Amino acid sequence: MNHIALFEPRIHFNTGNIARTCAATNTVLHLIEPFGFEISDKHLKRAGLDYWDKVNIVYHKNLQDFMNSIADGGQLYLVSKFAEHVYSDVDYSDDKKDHYFLFGREDTGLPEEFMHEHRDECIRIPMNDEHVRSLNLSNCACMIVYEALKQQEFRGLELVHTYEKDKLK
């Protein structure tokens, strides 16, 4: 199973968009406190639209609480622009295994000491950093979870769907 973990998220729109992606992909969302917004924030709810009840959300009091919760197994990946390994070069194909994709705060990322401790688990999305400091958090979460799902052959997701008012028929 795939998991997206957000360390101290600051921007409610990002968290809401990521929640919507989690609902669409059967991905568990882990939210690590403290947040830069109120969970009841109307903008957060609007960004997630009416999918909040479809998202499996796990709340953690801090980073150590999150780490304790995954200590029993699974693979942790820290997503950072400072990583050496490209996310698409990693094997996520085992869909029986828990894959935890941990994203840092939008403004400061993950704690530096923590990243050094988990250096081998760090992955990055390639980009031209001459023009841009970073990519949008919700876009990054979406790219990485869909790469994992692609390698897992999109098991559990609809590959073909017929809509009552299909605009292509």
Swiss-Prot record:
GO molecular function: RNA binding; tRNA (5-carboxymethylaminomethyluridine(34)-2'-O)-methyltransferase activity; tRNA (cytidine(34)-2'-O)-methyltransferase activity
Gene Ontology CC terms, in alphabetical order: cytoplasm
An individual GO BP term: wobble position ribose methylation
Subcellular location: Cytoplasm
Binding site for S-adenosyl-L-methionine: 79, 104, 125, 134
Catalytic activity: cytidine(34) in tRNA + S-adenosyl-L-methionine = 2'-O-methylcytidine(34) in tRNA + S-adenosyl-L-homocysteine + H(+); 5-carboxymethylaminomethyluridine(34) in tRNA(Leu) + S-adenosyl-L-methionine = 5-carboxymethylaminomethyl-2'-O-methyluridine(34) in tRNA(Leu) + S-adenosyl-L-homocysteine + H(+)
Protein function: Could methylate the ribose at the nucleotide 34 wobble position in tRNA.
Xref: PANTHER family: TRNA (CYTIDINE(34)-2'-O)-METHYLTRANSFERASE
Protein family per UniProt: Belongs to the class IV-like SAM-binding methyltransferase superfamily. RNA methyltransferase TrmH family. TrmL subfamily.
Full protein name: Putative tRNA (cytidine(34)-2'-O)-methyltransferase
